[in-house]
Regions:
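Structural motif
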Residues: 32-36, 57-61, 74-77, 104, ...
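Histidine/acidic-rich helix-loop-helix segments that form or flank divalent-metal centers
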Residues: 108-152, 163-173
């Protein structure tokens, strides 16, 4: 498993801490083998250099795990939402397909992944549009309210991670979050 360059020493510690917390929060809803299969998907995605740090330098696996903790702990969502969140980058970058995810984890997980990918594609095209049409389009694209809740949790996580960042991109992200939040 050659993921050493992908995670800093600090991130490795954080990764194990988040893993334990997430397992504690969702362990009873996970099916046998979910964690092992998820790890295999993530390692494969990392080893194939399919995901990279974002504009803030945040590690996408750590960011998704932090968001998954918010989803589980603060919103109360369980297996399908957590797995969908953790696997959506692997599907988006082509390491695996939504059909494979559906066969391994079920339609519920695959549906959340499809929703996250669709909403993220829409959102990346126009993240700060304030119109009522965009709000309606976003909700229509999501099809599943869990997708919107996961996106809100993701924005909350990003806001927490970049609170001390002074650059313009951080401010744009903050504005983007407020618009998404206002749409709810």
């Amino acid at each position: 498993m050659e993921t050493d360059e992908f995670f800093t020493i600090k991130e490795k510690d954080l990764l194990f801490s988040l893993y334990r917390k997430l397992l504690q929060l969702s362990g009873e809803t996970l099916q046998k083998g979910d964690c092992k299969k998820l790890k295999t998907h993530l390692v494969n995605t990392i080893q194939n250099n399919r995901i990279q740090r974002d504009i803030f330098g945040l590690n996408p696996v750590i960011k998704d795990m932090q968001t998954a903790v918010i989803v589980a702990e603060e919103i109360g969502m369980k297996r399908a939402s957590i797995l969908g969140l953790m696997l959506h980058d692997s599907v988006r970058c082509g390491t695996c397909t939504a059909l494979e995810v559906e066969q391994i984890y079920g339609e519920d997980v695959a549906g959340i992944i499809r929703g996250l990918i669709r909403v993220n594609e829409l959102y990346s095209k126009s993240p700060t549009i304030e119109s009522e049409n965009f709000r309606n389009l976003l909700l229509t694209f999501a099809e599943d309210m869990r997708v919107i809740l996961i996106m809100i949790a993701d924005r909350v996580n990003i806001m927490r991670q970049i609170k001390d960042c002074k650059n313009d991109e951080a401010r744009r992200q903050a504005v983007s979050y407020t618009h998404l939040r206002a749409h709810e």
